[in-house]
Amino acid sequence: MEHTASLPGYVREKLAELDLELSEGDITQKGYEKKRAKLLQPFLKKPEGDKVKSTPPPPYYNVKNANNSTNHGNINNDGVIVSSEGYSYVTEVPSLSSSQQRHSKKIDFHQQAAMSLSSAPQSGNAGAPGYENMRPQGGAVGDPGYQNTREPSAFQNQQSTNNSQHRQRRTQRKVTHNEKRYHSEVRQEAVQQALAALKGRPKPSLPMPSKRTSVLNRSPGCNDELDSSTDDESIPEETISPDKEYNYPRDHISNSILPPEPIIKPPIRESSMGSQQHARTDVKQNQITNQKYTAPNSAPERRPPQNLPPLPTSEPLSSDYPPIAYKRENDFSDKAFKQKQYNAPDITQFNNAHRAADRVTRYVNVSQNELNETDANGKWKVSAKIQQLLNTLKRPKRRPLPEFYEDNDIELEIAANTKDPNAPKPEGSTMTPVQGEQLSIPAGLPRTLECALQRYGTNSFKSPMATVLDPNGKVTTTLTYGKLLSRAQKIAHALSTKIFSKGPEQVTLKPGDRVALVYPNNDPLSFITAWYGCMFRGLVPLPIELPLSSSDTPPQQVGFLLSSCGITVALTSEACLKGLPKSTTTGEIAKLKGWPRLQWFVTEHLPKPPKEFNVGNLRADDSAAAYIEYTTDKEGSVMGVTVTRAAMINHCRALTMACHYTEGETIVCVLDFKREVGLWHSVLTSVLNGMHVIFIPYALMKLRPSSWMQLITKHRASCCLVKSRDLHWGLLATKDHKDISLSSLRMLLVADGANPWSLSSCDQFLSVFQAKGLRSDAICPCASSSEVFTVSLRRPGRGSCGFSPSATGRGVLSMAALSHGVVRVDSEDSLTSLTLQDCGQVMPAAQMVVVRSEGPPVLCKTDQVGEICVTSGSTSASYFGLDGMTNSTFKVQPLLEELEQPKDGNGTVNIISKPIGEDFYVRSGLLGFLGPGGLVFVCGSRDGLMTVTGRKHNADDIIATVLAVEPMRFIYRGRIAVFSIKVLRDERVCVIAEQRPDCSEEESFQWMSRVLQAVDSIHQVGIYCLALVPPNHLPKTPLGGIHLCEARRRFLEGSLHPANVLMCPHTCVTNLPKPRELHQGVQTAAKLSSSSGCGITDTGVGPASVMVGNLVQGNRLAEAHGRDVGLAEDCERKPQLITGVLRWRANTSPDHIIFTLLNSKGAIAKTLTCSELHKRAEKIAALLQERGRIEPGDHVALIFPPGLDLLCAFYGCLYLGAIPITIRPPHPQNLNTTLPTVRMIVDVSKSGIVLSIQPIIKLLKSREAATSIDPKTWPPILDIDDNPKRKYAGIATVSFDSSAYLDFSVSTCGRLSGVNITHRSLSSLCASLKLACELYPSRHVALCLDPYCGLGFVMWTLIGVYSGHHSILIAPYEVEANPSLWLSTLSQHRVRDTFCSYGVIELCTKALSNSIPSLKQRNIDLRCVRTCVVVAEERPRVQLTQQFCKLFQALGLNTRCVSTSFGCRVNPAICVQGASSAESAQVYVDMRALRNNRVALVERGAPNSLCVIESGKLLPGVKVIIANPETKGHCGDSHLGEIWVQAPHNANGYFTIYGDETDYNDHFNAKLVTGATSELYARTGYLGFLRRTECSQSASLLDETTPSVASRDSDTESLNSISQLQLNFSNVSLGGNSEHSLVGGASNANDQELHDAVYVVGAVDEVISLRGMNYHPIDIENSVMRCHKKIAECAVFTWTNLLVVVVELDGNESEALDLVPLVTNTVLEDHQLIVGVVVVVDPGVVPINSRGEKQRMHLRDGFLADQLDPIYVAYNM
């Protein structure tokens, strides 16, 4: 058994380095394990004796006695003792290295348990003066909230022995990437108390998201093969027989046996252990009292959940998951750690053979074991999870929704920024400007920087100016003042003589030109020489970072800055030039994205300047620019801050005075020397004073965090420039502390002293290093900004300046008051206090005020937080090239508000503001206030401020709280980004953290739920999104910090790739519109109506709709007619039997080719003439009669692929008088889902016989088919190619009112229905279509659609025979094989009319988008096409048709010819664009009015506008009205309601097997309750509206002449709202009814100015009712599709009032979690709905029917039955 303490020193150092590499992410977990095992190999062979047993637990565990109970201690295998609450208290990273933590099980359990039985914990500071132990003693002793401040008495006597070990062990502490982030211990305690307080409340468990196994394997360190979505309440218990033993990977046992506070229940099995095992480690589960966390209704004696990864079982996994081998990781002990009796995982979900992603048929394959998944409660796994989510949401919220329902944005805005009447108000007097001391320039200080360099370079040329350390910590090169001077002169001379070619012209650099300085962070010496070279030449340097690696931020923002500054030359070093990205072809330096073309100039190896070259004779103006420094704003745009020469030298003088710099001092600099504090001190002020700077590159700091302290000790440095993270890192490097002496240090400048976490790092650093000579007055926090430079600085030594010597201060402030912008002192022990330290006083010669951060710059009150503004001779001058922003930032005149008394004494008191003086102040971007004695307190920055529901929160404060949520072992300390995003008019807080690689799924969720609670209770603000990303995934700044803007940008564009996401919109979003409530009168009407309507309730039959002639209160009633069929020739007027027509055609034109079938190559596969069709039909009739014994009126099922056999079989049945039912054949690749549907239709239609072709008959009887349908149970099956013995006698005579065929189809809601079509309907439908589309024998019509139901069937089989035109048939599956097939056919056969489906349009648009040039080469010309009708039963898909038209316009397609038809179950063709009708009209309606069942017309491009296009033109003989689906009242024009249709070709009722036609009876004979109450209509089941429209022949968009209605009109107004439109349309006033104006159709052009357009909005059954409003899924889906380019398809449905969004991810599985926040944001923003569940699935999972419509109900069933195999399921809280 090894303790690292017993290892030799060199091994310990190597181990520490390894740990550091792992924590930095420089080495993989696997490589780490390997190297570590190798290192420890020689020391592992020592025998383990009794001494092991007596090893005390390491002193960094806060061992607590669990309520003095006599249980055997709740001990994790890590030795982490657990209190009865189920917390584990571990300091953030114990000094044991992480892997040791994970692998070593050193302490015998009984031994440790015995220790934990010691008496109640008492106070005592354990161990070395570690920085974790800083909490002041005292306070609530029994509180479980402290980390490591108290140890049980059992440890007191061991302390002395442990101290040395403790110190040694700290050497292995992980040093994490803690870029300037550091947490306050006070906060830590507050967080723990807050969490403890919350713990008392019974908490419903939040469901944990489900991840697919492969995603789990990808996410850091998770080998748990967790079931895709399981939940412990709904899983049958199973046990493994005790003889099976499994070896667990060690980290699983250690990390997951303890469920720390199961707020979120992980998806795990219930354990089923016998009590006999309590002596084993399993004891710990039973100790954790489970009562507190189970949902309130569960009995306390439930077994606690067993938090272990499921074990591998012998069941085979499906083909896509390789069997998992659980291998043990390197083990230090030889004993195998065996565990018995855990449950086998449920792998049933993957047992089905791998499903092909076939959309059309996806989810009926529930294998047997899945059916048994439901337990006694009968709940599905998913449903249990959603139940949990619902219970969570039922919890009363702290902030109720404001009570209002409003459509418009102003109200949403007001709701987002509520004013709290109880908010504290500032009470102090108005502040006065604070003056810094007078600037006294020491005698002999050089006049300018150039003079300084010349003086020191000649007089003391050997004294060192700068030294840089190499990555090993050795001093490599020192730059003396002499060398600096000569090199800078060389550069200045070279730059003045070098000629750069800028395109054709030659240019030299003139004084005042701007150049870029591009140097790596480890080469300050070249940077300084180049900087002073530019100074000597009068050039303006702009130092920039060079992103060398792809993980850095995109450099294009910097490129914009370079372009705007007009920079063409970049100075760089040779080494840096070599590292620049080169172009592969030319080998030259590649042009970076967004960058201008640069000339690179290397500043080394330059010739000596000639004797006469004198740098001193350049006299630059003081107001000229000296340099430009880049800075970024909140949104991430990069700006250049221009600094004048006067400001630069003044600032150096002020720093010299404030810091008491003298010549020859040594400074150590850890900061970035290219900008801000690092640049001002180490490059500029140091040269002015002739000081020596030692630079420590960031790479060395990562490797040896204490190197800066060692340098101070070695060089006796007097000043040091650091950030608080360097103090923190230095504290952790305890092994180096013994040799350090900081007594020479007079100033330790903390550059980010303004951050809330800097206070505790300063305090702890001082407490540890005071013993090493550090003086308390040496620590100098300062505040700075690029605009103001140094805002304030605590003076070193304190005594010499004019302020009181003891001028340091700290304030304990109330965070709640700060969020309202007010300073209030809080008590020390308050949970919600923030402790701030001062940032010193105002700089010499500067004047400071604090002004309001919003609105005009009015002076703040003394107790008010505002933005700090400074005026002095040493601030920046402007943002380069941005005049507007410059004026608002650099030219601020603070205003003083005064009350003006009215003259006559009785008027109102006015507030007037006047400037306090002439001076212009500069905004610093820092928020704060001035304390007593002129001390400056900074409590945030303008960029880090988040205003959530009217209260201000500082990102840094939230980071501090997040960091204090222990245990920190789940995430990396400093790698946290907090920012806000604007969603639904308010800012929402997002927290992104980097997760450690060894953190399991449950642990990270445990941690996330604690963070939510901590932030909520301390800041009273909800976190909207909390995400964990894999290690090193947050974008970095060049010095290793987090690049916040870039992280935010990636988050918003969906390229951050988080490993875990928790969204909490339900608790954060409090400004949703109030749900609508029904009016009283309407509710009763709604109750009376029996229909399953969609909840349209606001047009009840009431006084508003009193009938006035044919108008409702001046508004037309919604009614429209197609033209009269009577205008056609006489033969069309009387109905004809289709069989008679066919026989007539066979006699009169026997050789006329009537059908042509094409194959996938576009070649003619088969043709049929009229006589061939007639003969084959006769033959099939004979076959049916002879072999099938079919009588007239019998039902025959036709199962054929799209083709000519289907036609012949159909007419064969009609000849016989039998009733055919066409059925789509089953899909050979997907039999087990498609075959049951086929069988169902055969059964439901009562077909006595099946007619088909040989391949399909074989398929029906195959072995594969037998698994789902027994082949013996089919009715008799006939082969169409069999020959009958006799000829068929004669065509049966049937009546017009007998059934011709049954039309079966499955609706999008999954309802299978068959409608009965009589011969009369069939004949009138054909007549109507023939008339509208002008079809006659010489026409060619191309059809590319499915011939099984609706209009597709009519076009394919009936209309060609009726009108005799030539039909060119293309089966849609052929187009999948050859996407250009349909278009090339149109071109080749010069087709004028074509009918297709949306599936075909989509396929062409997607597959051919890049092939237009090649199609042109093949001479494909679409100018011949006159009408292209998309056959659909839904709202026309405007976007898709527009894309299609735009794409193929290039091939001559006239965009006006594409239109959509509308048909439905009750009538297959209501609207079809005719041959001579005008193009479809578009209108824009307000989406928010639509969801309240109103139609409000708006202009194109208006917010919330939705483009709706009319569905073709009404067919001749069709009459359509709009009725309220609930009340059956007649609606007015432009009102939303159900479309009712009256036509001779309506279907004649449903044919259903169950005979329950009661419910659907009124679908075919509905009557209005107002108006013409005697007429019968068929109800289409679709919502829509009618609108009188001008037939514009030109512009398809809303014409300027159409007045738009105000986008909102209330329920009562909407009746009148459209009436003003009528004034424009003279026809309306002439003849109120549209019949007169439309009679004559095309014949009379004057009459065709107006027509009634039918606009379909969506199916009644599909409407989603949420929060009292009605949404159409397509609208939500369109929003979701737009939110990320990787979303291939999307479908939404509701389940128990939760909105579920399913998105198909067309990309890498690692991108799945990017979609969750984006989907949630988009739906909130566009529809004001909160998404409850986001399911990310593979492409092809959303099922789609043959018409290209989504089967949302199938999808829902598949989701609830857990058959989707999702990549990720996120449950939004």
Swiss-Prot record:
The keyword Transcription regulation does not apply. Residues 113-125, 146-165, 272-297 have a biased composition (Polar residues). It is a peripheral membrane protein. Expressed in the developing nervous system. Ubiquitously expressed in the developing brain. Within the mushroom body, a higher level is detected in the core of lobes and peduncle in the late third instar larva. Detected in whole mushroom body neuron structures at 48 hours after puparium formation and during later stages. Pfam families: AMP-binding, AMP-dom_DIP2-like, DMAP_binding. Disruption phenotype: Mushroom body lobe defects including ectopic axon bifurcations and/or axon guidance defects. RNAi-mediated knockdown results in an increase in the number of mushroom body lobes as well as ectopic lobes and guidance defects. Residues 3-110 form the DMAP1-binding domain. GO terms for cellular component: plasma membrane. Residues 166-175 have a biased composition (Basic residues). GO terms for biological process: acetyl-CoA biosynthetic process; axon guidance. Transmembrane segments: none annotated. One of its GO terms (molecular function) is acetate-CoA ligase activity. It is found in: Cell membrane. Residues 224-236 have a biased composition (Acidic residues). Required for precise axonal bifurcation in mushroom body neurons by suppressing ectopic bifurcation and regulating the guidance of sister axons. May function by regulating expression of tdp1. Acts downstream of the serine/threonine-protein kinase Bsk to modulate the direction of axon projection. May play a role in fatty acid metabolism. Belongs to the DIP2 family. This is Disco-interacting protein 2. It comes from Drosophila melanogaster. The gene is DIP2.
